[in-house]
Amino acid sequence: MAINLDDKKAIVAEVQEAANGAHSVVIADARGVAVEAITVLRKQARENGVWMKVVRNTLARRAVEGTEFECVSDVFKGPSLIAFSSDHPGAAARLFTDFAKANENFELKAAAFEGNAVDVNMLAKLPTYDEAISRLMSVMKEASAGKLARTFAAIRDQKEQEAA
């Protein structure tokens, strides 16, 4: 189906707007995946703050040109499903890797974060903000418990030396 020039410009502008407000991008090939499954994926994407769309390759290349995601423009071959994470850098990657496990025809092509092409699985393993805060708090809590134990050991050693 032919798209007129104004529609093409609108699509490029829409993708550029999503790219400019995003932390990361993930590109996948969804050939052979049922429409119902893609509909469920789109719903999950909206719930997780992920913007996704099937975009023609030339339009996608033009849209990411001049953005920090230009590093993945060479993977736009064949049908491309592009997803931008705006809330959390790993949201789209996590969503797509989980979906790929359930749908063998869903192929992850590439991902980019902070201007660099990265492994999709590495990006998916990034902790969310809440997970990172809880990890930091547990490390701080463990550190204070360790300090307390070392203090008790030092007091014990000091008393043993005084008794001797």
Swiss-Prot record:
Ion transport found in the keyword field: no
Keyword annotations from UniProtKB, A to Z: Ribonucleoprotein, Ribosomal protein, RNA-binding, rRNA-binding
GO molecular function: large ribosomal subunit rRNA binding
The keyword Ribosomal protein belongs to this UniProt entry's keyword annotation: yes
Function of the molecule: Forms part of the ribosomal stalk, playing a central role in the interaction of the ribosome with GTP-bound translation factors.
HAMAP family in UniProt: Ribosomal_uL10 (MF_00362)
Protein name: Large ribosomal subunit protein uL10
Higher taxonomy: Bacteria, Pseudomonadati, Pseudomonadota, Gammaproteobacteria, Alteromonadales
